[in-house]
Amino acid sequence: MIVAGVDEVGRGCLFGPVWAAAVILKAEAFDRLPALGVTDSKALSAKRRQALLPEIHSHCLSYGLGQASAACIDAVGIRAATELAMCRALQRLCHSPDHVLVDGSLPLRPWPGSQETVVAGDSHCLAIACASILAKEGRDALLQRLDQRWPGYGLASHKGYGTKAHRTALLQWGPTPLHRLSFLAPELKGGSPAGASSGNLE
């Protein structure tokens, strides 16, 4: 039976897409990766996550990434957008899973196949832990690039979360097209930066 683990990152951010990864591991991964310290991405430093990436890639039978944009989040809500990102990640796997392990307590409603929720799955399930690392590193790399486009917001440091520095930048500059307006308090929704263009509803 082919089992995939799926996890998301960026659900609580004020900026940018919610990102997901799905992973199907090779049999030998279950000995090798725990010995290397693979666990929940939140428990690992950025340097350690980056060091683990090639090991995770080499021990995957298949992996896929998916995202849903800030515009999509504003349109359909964070839960539906997160489900969309997860389904996109699963659909990009090279092998169709017989069963999906979903991090958290909420089922993946659009997924038509067999699935199981795993509370704190990124700490207790190796495939979900690997997915959490791939999702985190993928989204962080995107935020590093977007920091160059909007350098005044500190995106490379806070990764879109609602830190004091991020909120101060919003008060000064207003939201970019990639901010989630539905997540912002009224006082943070001022004018958009000069030259801004609308984000895609994906």
UniProtKB/Swiss-Prot annotation:
UniProt binding sites for a divalent metal cation: D7, E8, D103
Keywords: Cytoplasm, Endonuclease, Hydrolase, Manganese, Metal-binding, Nuclease
Record's keyword annotation contains NAD: no
Catalytic activity of the protein: Endonucleolytic cleavage to 5'-phosphomonoester
Entry note: cofactor: Manganese or magnesium. Binds 1 divalent metal ion per monomer in the absence of substrate. May bind a second metal ion after substrate binding.
RNase H type-2 domain sequence ranges: 1-195
Alphabetized Pfam families for the sequence: RNase_HII
Name the UniProt record assigns to this protein: Ribonuclease HII
Protein species of origin: Synechococcus sp. (strain RCC307)
